Amino acid sequence: MNLFSVPNSLAAAIASFGFAVLPALAAPDRAHVVNVYAWSDYFPPSVVEKFQAETGMHVNYTVFDSPDTAETALSVGSSNYDIVTMNASPHLAREIPKRFWKKLDQSQIPNARNADPQILKILGQVDPGNLYAVPWMWGTVGVIYNAEKAKSILGLLPAESLDLIFKKELAAKFEKCGISVLDSWQDILPLMARYLGQPQLSAEPAQLAAVLKKLEEIRPFLRRISTSGYYEQLADGELCLSIGYSGDAMIARRMAQEGGTKIPVDYAFPRVSVPLYIDSMVIPADSPNYAGALKFINFMMRPEISAEVTRFIGFASGNAAAVPFLDLSMRTNSIIYPPPEVRARFETERVYTSDELRTFNRAWQRFRTGE
């Protein structure tokens, strides 16, 4: 999951609330500092202020622009971070065996019992026994679109929303109003593989070649390949169609209404399968403030706090007890909380070998640069 990077419209808000969007720094009394490494608005200013006021601890908030960046920073050791948000697959799946994270003292985080059972069960596939990670936010990957533009260009939408971008004949119709896809092979390559009827993304030459050929066909029609800022462009009309995250669809919709463009931003789930991402709170193995990190997790898993975050960013909470604290309109919003028939199509990534990772990374770089 994904999601965001600085700069974005919320970075200034974060900075204005008195906690740092800076590299994590040591403090004279480290027991009173919690260094957080996360997406830019996963812990909004309001909830961080409440945590600081209640505990007397100071939060340094460092923003990353991709889980790969975070993984690289953590792999060198001595990161000085206490809390990190990380996606379940593929990152946690390969990091837990490498001892990136510290086991959680469940007695210190009683609010972790509020976790959504379905999400916790899926997370357990990469964290057996749920020993290391507490689910924070989750969502899906799908097609975000300007409903007004789509109707004027096509009339009725295709049954498979991915056709809008993955079929070159349809992508050509939307080229002028702007198409984007996520700059994330972990999201796009498996999605294209399933779209083509493959059971999963494979490095087998013929299967991978088919995936890349189909992507190369639509490459000329893409205005942007990015995981950050695309939701702002959907809100202001610079883009009309994107493969993106469900939470970003909600942000784009809100920005369009609050910003005055009133663009009707909508979201469609893929029919072939629905990619699910789960971002969790984890504690680095070398955290200097393990006790403070546990207090942070327990505080954030309070139902009313988790609900406040969901209201702010529009992502589904991994905290089932938070749902009753949401407005009816948000609880019943199918983009945030998909209905059972969509949940039945949830899929998460498998764990790739080192050779596969290198193959997919190289293939994606060639695609994104148009080589």
Predicted regions and their residues:
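Early extracytoplasmic/lumenal segment of secretory-pathway proteins
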Residues: 26-95
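Extracytoplasmic ligand-binding site segments that recognize negatively charged/polar headgroups
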Residues: 87-92, 96-221, 228-235
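A ligand-binding cleft/hinge motif common to bilobed small-molecule-binding domains
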Residues: 90-94, 241-262
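Conserved C-terminal helix/tail region of periplasmic/extracytoplasmic solute-binding proteins
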Residues: 340-371
